[in-house]
From Swiss-Prot:
Protein name as annotated: Thymidylate kinase
Catalytic reactions of this protein: dTMP + ATP = dTDP + ADP
GO biological process, one term: dTDP biosynthetic process
Protein function: Phosphorylation of dTMP to form dTDP in both de novo and salvage pathways of dTTP synthesis.
Keyword Transcription regulation included in the entry's annotation: no
Residues engaged in binding ATP: 11-18
EC number: 2.7.4.9
One Pfam match: Thymidylate_kin
Family, as annotated: Belongs to the thymidylate kinase family.
InterPro entries registered for this protein in UniProt: P-loop_NTPase, Thymidylate_kin-like_dom, Thymidylate_kin_CS, Thymidylate_kinase
């Protein structure tokens, strides 16, 4: 049996991360990997879910400054990693996470302009460089992604940011993803059926390379 793995799905709003998480979970089950935990960041613990609501809430006169947003993201992330992700992996459970540390580099680093060295310092200090075994980055143009997001629900605080913000965020995502050998880039501008097919193909190829 393959040792439990930590798989992360990344991408802008409307990229199809939820669909990808479900697709991968079902694919793992078809390949006899039945113990799978789905989580989301920020969230998936009581404390982290409260932080999520705070981050996404629109305040009349006191929205979060970018540094506060970054630190809250890390507070939620650390809580989830220590309370759920690490224990699950230790017990042989595979973990699929909707977002992880790359989101902070892209959103707070690329989009909001916080120096990336600060984010790397937080990663090193609090996560001890805890990184995924595989990241799947769903690359979608901001125009297409936000149009999809608008069809779901009213936009939250982060989703309501400017197109320029999301273009900077996407640029950072692509820059980091192309440099990471553990990251697979999927064209998420395509329809959901084609994206699912491409994810399945890439995942099966990756699974076949894992050491038992």
């Amino acid at each position: 049996m393959i040792k439990s793995k930590f798989i992360v799905i990344e991408g802008l709003e409307g990229a199809g991360k939820t669909n990808a998480c479900i697709c991968i979970k079902n694919l793992l089950k078809k390949n006899s990997i039945k113990n799978v935990l789905l989580v989301r960041q920020p969230g998936s613990t009581p404390i982290a879910e409260d932080i999520r609501r705070l981050i996404k809430k629109k305040f009349n006169d006191d929205n979060l400054i970018k540094e506060t947003e970054l630190l809250l993201m890390y507070a939620a992330r650390i809580q989830l990693v220590e309370k759920k992700i690490k224990p699950a992996l230790k017990n042989g459970i595979w973990v699929i996470s909707d977002r992880h540390d790359l989101s902070s580099l892209a959103y707070q680093g690329g989009g909001l302009g916080i120096p990336k060295k600060i984010i790397y310092q937080l990663q090193s200090l609090f996560l001890n460089n805890f990184i995924p075994d595989l990241t799947i980055y769903l690359d979608v143009s901001p125009e297409i992604g936000l149009a999809r997001a608008l069809k779901r629900n009213p936009l939250d605080l982060i989703e309501s940011r400017s197109l320029f913000f999301f273009k900077k965020t996407r640029r950072c995502y692509l820059e980091k993803s192309k440099l990471d050998k553990k990251t697979i880039i999927i064209n998420a501008n395509l329809n959901i059926k084609k994206v699912t097919q491409n994810i399945t193909k890439k995942m099966l190829n990756w699974l076949n390379k894992q050491v038992i």
